[in-house]
């Protein structure tokens, strides 16, 4: 999906014009992928706009940086305030927010410690991510495995990890699928190229544990919280790929994907091919909270002030 530019980007504590947010070609991140990032959504609401689970996202950015021995020069509160600042200055909501911390221009070589750390935060309009919409996506099991836990840390949302995601997504696209599902090194279900995955079987909601090379998704955690609140039985356990074929319902979760039903896997229909009752129940609660149509019972929303907000469209 093409990027729609806004006016300002936050860089190292200052708002600068969008077109000036450039980096040098010899920056460490360009050569070695030394970055960590986040994806966050700001939702339009009847009374304005709000960022969904902002502190949790920015804490994960800090955690990802720590795993890669990057000490960010900003506190959690400062980073959260910067997100609000850039949204309110650009006046764009709903929107997608992309904070990124990277090793900049300084030294060449694999050891990154001599290169400075730069932090950017951008926001821009962005719609649905997974093709298929409310009717469900046609996806496949990828021939590419997710990264082994002793090679790349899955708990870090690092730019370099997404080279693996690109292989999964491109393979799916070439073969006519909306998305691919990666297995871990033991052949168990891990996640999509950029989404966590859930399956429903006989009324029980299953999702792979983080030990299956899955990212600790904020939306994943939100869905687990919602499901337990709704009284749904939830099990975090390893899932063989064939369970996805015989599941009653399967759906993706993620900041970009939100809650996205899956219609078929490897051209095998999931259930009757339509979004199932539990998927709808969870999605209704998720979007209801995010769009301000239901109470913020879990304290997930950070209000922002913008002059114009697009109407809520769930």
Residue ranges of each PLM-predicted region?
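Short secondary-structure junction motifs
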Residues: 94-96, 177-178
């Amino acid at each position: 999906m093409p990027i729609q530019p806004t006016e300002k980007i936050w860089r190292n504590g200052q708002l600068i014009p969008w077109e000036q947010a450039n980096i040098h070609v010899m920056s460490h991140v360009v050569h070695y992928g030394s970055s960590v990032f986040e994806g966050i959504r700001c939702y339009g609401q009847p009374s304005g706009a709000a960022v969904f689970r902002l502190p949790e996202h920015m804490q994960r950015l800090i955690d990802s940086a720590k795993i890669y021995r990057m000490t960010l020069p900003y506190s959690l509160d400062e980073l959260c305030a910067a997100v609000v600042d850039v949204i309110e200055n650009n006046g764009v909501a709903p929107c997608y927010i992309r904070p990124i911390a990277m090793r900049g221009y300084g030294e060449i070589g694999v050891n990154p410690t001599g290169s400075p750390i730069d932090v950017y935060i951008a926001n821009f309009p962005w719609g649905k991510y997974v093709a298929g919409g409310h009717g469900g996506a046609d996806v496949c099991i990828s021939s590419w495995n997710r990264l082994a836990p002793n090679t790349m840390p899955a708990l870090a949302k690092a730019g370099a990890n997404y080279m693996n995601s690109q292989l999964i997504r491109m393979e799916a696209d070439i073969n006519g699928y909306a998305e691919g599902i990666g297995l871990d090194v033991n052949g168990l279900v891990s996640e999509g190229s950029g989404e966590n995955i859930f399956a429903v079987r006989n009324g029980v909601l299953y999702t792979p544990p983080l030990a299956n090379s899955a990212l600790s998704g904020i939306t994943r955690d939100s869905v687990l919280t919602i499901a337990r609140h709704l009284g749904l039985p939830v099990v975090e356990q390893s899932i063989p790929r064939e369970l996805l074929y015989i599941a009653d319902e399967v759906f993706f979760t993620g900041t970009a994907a939100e809650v996205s039903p899956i219609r078929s896997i490897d051209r095998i229909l999931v259930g009757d091919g339509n979004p199932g009752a539990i998927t709808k129940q969870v999605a209704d609660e998720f979007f209801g909270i995010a769009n301000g149509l239901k109470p913020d019972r879990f304290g997930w929303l950070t209000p922002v002030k913008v002059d114009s907000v697009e109407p809520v469209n769930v």
